[in-house]
A protein has these predicted regions:
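Leucine-rich repeat
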Residues: 189-194, 220-224, 249-252
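Recognition helices and adjacent regulatory flanks at domain boundaries
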Residues: 98-127, 137-139, 160
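Core AdoMet radical
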Residues: 126-136, 147-187, 200-216, 229-315, ...
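Catalytic cores of alpha/beta
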Residues: 338-354
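Accessory C-terminal segments flanking Radical SAM cores
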Residues: 3-108, 395-509
Length: 509
């Protein structure tokens, strides 16, 4: 309970620190970057649109993957107290009276050594880096697109884009598709590997996304680099669907993580071990490893959203990963759309069940003896029980016909949301949390409440709802999905039948 209170208090303190600089300051614009290397795009945090990195800038400095001229202008705006329009996601939440991701991100531990660097808007080494090396993916999630998934691209090549009255959705002619060259010839991938040794020195968080990272060789190149070049400050993570096409892949991945976890000696001439005042270190190859698992619902509804997910296989792999590794964590990412809501309470129950199964009270304090170094015998490394199950519920912005715009039109969905919020409050962490790790945290409850408030603000009047373009798109899109994939929306989502019929009638069907 105290940990949760301290977390929220830290965010409020960070808000005050940001406001002393300006009312629009955000540390993420300096110290966080998401890189989409297949099509050469970059953005700081996932809310602003990704923008192309000009090759002319990249040729001068591989660090332009983060420090583009455009981003330098946005940083200056923030220092001046202006609100960059590309950050509207946070402005919308703040204007609704809530703390936004601007506050949450700026309060993260990885940003704290950068407060003295923010006056420099030009050349910054990010501390938090997300990278997508490759669009290769064996899934075609309903809210995804061909430029992020080869399976989606294959479907569009076979059937064409989705004709939704006034738009052609997922038309590859208008998407920023990956370069039609091999990964080795991609100038952005080359620039990344040229930048990597310098970037790695100050890196605190590194996250690989996709596509599906587990089927990309760059992922294993990174893991091998970390094994050979340990970094005590590094939080390493991967976002995965955790259902690779071959079981050998999951085994290979787990074996790499087990090697990273191994306790070892090493010397780093560029870093001081403050505890012993020397350059020698003992520990695992990184601070810790987290696996982010994309999962938006449970059972058949999860399989529909993240087609062709095998839900039982995913659960098996979750358990296998947690059982075979010692210090790892899993964070489930529920991309919050209209399809997430019908089984939201069941999703939350899954979180509770896993927190019980892999809770702190099921773990023991480990004493791992490092290998001797000459005649010196190092004391055992102590590994304490930890929280291993996390989740997040970022709201989907696009496509609009799955977003908060349409969610608010179905009162039954609002009732499910309110019931789910009550469920979380009824299962809030108790005083024995330090021993168990069970229950929901206050800030997790606050995030769902925030989502609900935003959704309710989007409610349309009956006359506005009629002929609303997103209703048309909703019906047309999922009707075509069912036709192409031999699925059945109504059978899978019976909770949405009334909404479906309204959307169907709005299409004149």
């Amino acid at each position: 309970m105290q940990l949760d209170t301290d977390y929220l208090e830290n965010i409020k303190i960070t808000k005050d620190k940001l406001n002393k600089i300006s009312s629009s300051m955000c540390m993420a614009k300096w110290f966080q970057v998401s890189l989409h290397l297949p099509n050469g795009k970059t953005h700081s945090c996932f809310h602003p649109p990704a923008r192309l990195v000009p090759l002319t800038e990249l040729e001068q400095d591989p660090g332009a993957l983060h420090n583009t001229k455009h981003k330098q202008v946005q940083r200056q705006k923030m220092l001046n107290g202006e609100r960059p329009s590309e950050c509207e996601y946070c402005w919308k939440i703040e204007d609704a009276g809530h703390l936004s991701d601007r506050h949450y991100r700026s309060a993260e531990w990885w940003a704290q050594d950068g407060w003295n660097e923010i006056k420099n808007t030009d050349t910054i080494l990010p501390r938090y880096v997300e990278v997508n090396f490759n669009q290769a993916c064996n899934f075609k999630c309903v809210y995804c697109s061909p430029h992020l998934s080869t399976t989606w691209e294959k479907e569009i090549k076979e059937f064409g884009p989705y004709d939704l009255s006034n738009i052609k959705h997922n038309d590859t002619q208008y998407l920023d598709m990956p370069f039609q060259s091999s990964n080795d010839d991609n100038p952005y991938v080359k620039a990344f590997w040229n930048w990597w040794p310098e970037l790695y020195k100050t890196l605190k968080v590194f996250r690989m996304t996709g596509g599906e990272p587990l089927i990309d060789n760059n992922t294993y190149k990174i893991l091998d680099y970390v094994i050979k070049n340990p970094n005590t400050d590094l939080e390493l993570s991967i976002t995965s669907n955790l259902c690779p096409p071959d079981n050998k892949i999951i085994n290979r991945f787990i074996d790499k993580i087990k090697k990273i976890e191994q306790i070892r000696w090493w010397e780093d001439p560029n870093k001081l071990n403050k505890e012993y005042n020397n350059n020698n270190f003992v520990g695992s190859s990184c601070k810790h490893f987290s696996l982010f698992v994309s999962l938006d619902s449970v059972g058949e509804q999860a399989e529909y959203i993240r087609y062709p997910l095998d839900y039982n296989m995913l659960l098996d792999n979750v358990n296998k990963f947690l059982e075979k590794t010692l210090t790892t964590e899993i964070c489930f990412i529920n991309t919050f759309s209209i399809l997430s809501i019908p089984k939201l309470k069941d999703f939350l129950q899954l979180i509770l069940d896993l927190r019980i199964k892999f809770g702190k009270n099921t773990q023991t304090i480990l004493e791992i003896q490092p290998p001797d170094r000459g005649e010196y015998k190092h004391p055992p490394v102590i590994i304490k029980p930890k929280q291993r199950i996390w989740f997040d519920i970022p709201m989907l912005n696009n496509p609009k016909w799955m977003s908060d715009v349409v969610i608010a039109q179905d009162k039954s969905l609002l009732a499910i949301l309110d019931d789910s919020l009550t469920f979380m409050k009824d299962n809030v962490e108790q005083e024995d949390y330090y021993k168990t790790g069970h229950g929901f945290k206050k800030y997790e409850i606050e995030k769902l409440k925030r989502n609900i408030d935003i959704i309710k603000q989007k409610s349309l009047k009956d006359e506005e709802l009629k002929n609303h373009v997103e209703l048309k798109h909703f019906y047309m899109y999922f009707s075509e999905i069912d036709k192409r994939r031999k699925t059945d929306f109504i059978k899978t989502f019976p909770e949405l039948i009334d909404f479906w019929n309204i959307a169907k009638a709005d299409n004149g069907s």
